[in-house]
Amino acid sequence: DALAKGGDLFAGYTPEAIRVGDTAGDEPHASLYDAWGEYYRLYRQRFPDKFLFCNLFPAGASAKKLGAKNYAEYVAQFVEKVPADFISLDQYPFFSISLLKGIAFRLCLHTYDVVASACRESGRDFWLYFQTQGNWFDLIYALPSFEQIRWQAYAALAYGAKCLMHVSYTP
């Protein structure tokens, strides 16, 4: 909305020297990509020494949530419209519910494949949040073992990931 009004998006913003960048958002609908692309350009112009972070959905989100007919289109539209130097996402493949366990690895590897291909084709880095804890949100995620954490890291690196990240949620 502020972008459409044409005002100074950063008028009340003071970048702190200790902060390397900012977050644009998390898991956007593809309909936001045009605005995000413009925001990225303006941010880079105003703060050339900082970087703007965003994080996409992994494969498995519905077409309605993605705003695209499938995951490959969702990622391709991001690459086309948002001038980020990387594609970042979170992928949590270990579930405590049996039904989800069967599809989780296929979705995980599909995510890695789509994003890695898009990164290679566009010259971007592949960044990944991987699963290091369980039982948050709605208790569907399993606590991964050391071997499962290692598998995620090695699999992501095999697909060309350049940055591996994790989060820690606490009550």
Regions found by a protein language model. Name each.
Residues D1-P171:
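Glycan-processing catalytic domains of CAZymes
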